[in-house]
Amino acid sequence: MKTVVSLGQIDAIVLTAGASKRLGEPKALVDIHGESLIQILIRKLKGKKLRIIIVTRVELFNEMEKLGEKVVINTNPESGRTGSIQCGIKELESERCLIVPVDRPGFSNATIEKLINLEKTSCPSKNGRGGHPVILSKEDCEKILSSNPSTPLRDIINPVKIEVDDEFLHLNIDFPNDLEKLRKITIEHDL
């Protein structure tokens, strides 16, 4: 981790390094009514004054760089999501961070607000089932850095579950029909 700028500042690590094989196109770049999914997430996170770190694969670097945020390449994205999180943690300027997978956009602004005001590693939960994004404590950031990049995050940390009302918390963009559902939801709801 880099030198801490402010104890109150929180960085958001947006994960975009996945291969998107099931969807057939890069999830970060899918069009949602004239805006890419990554643009929607950045706007939502910037609204909470979070510093953005985008972790991506080499093939998407140029597109991600156009967004004007800090971009880091995971040179081995096949190793798993934890490896991408490690890449982002190494660039932190805050002690805590919010982990935001690009394919899990169903959280509300109220959920972000709840999470960034918590000190312990926590995640939103709907009906007892945890979701994303996840806020990481300084201690858990250090645990993740010392872990194998292929170790699933759930085997490294144990987030406190915070029950939220987000109807679409568990929306996961993996297949074309998920994308159509997201497009419909964004018209009908404030995501």
Model-derived features: where do they sit?
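Conserved alpha/beta core of the MobA/IspD/sugar-nucleotide pyrophosphorylase nucleotidyltransferase superfamily
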Residues: 2-12, 146-191
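Active-site catalytic microenvironments for nucleophilic, acid-base chemistry
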Residues: 91, 143, 185
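Flexible, gly/pro- and Lys/Arg-enriched active-site loops
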Residues: 112-156
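Glycine- and other small-residue-rich loops at beta-strand/loop junctions that grip anionic moieties
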Residues: 100, 133, 171
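Short aromatic/basic micro-patch
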Residues: 106, 135, 172-173
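Nucleotide and nucleotide-moiety/phosphate-recognizing core
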Residues: 7-124, 130, 161-166, 190
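Short histidine/acidic/glycine/proline-rich micro-motifs that form metal-
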Residues: 105-106, 140-142, 169
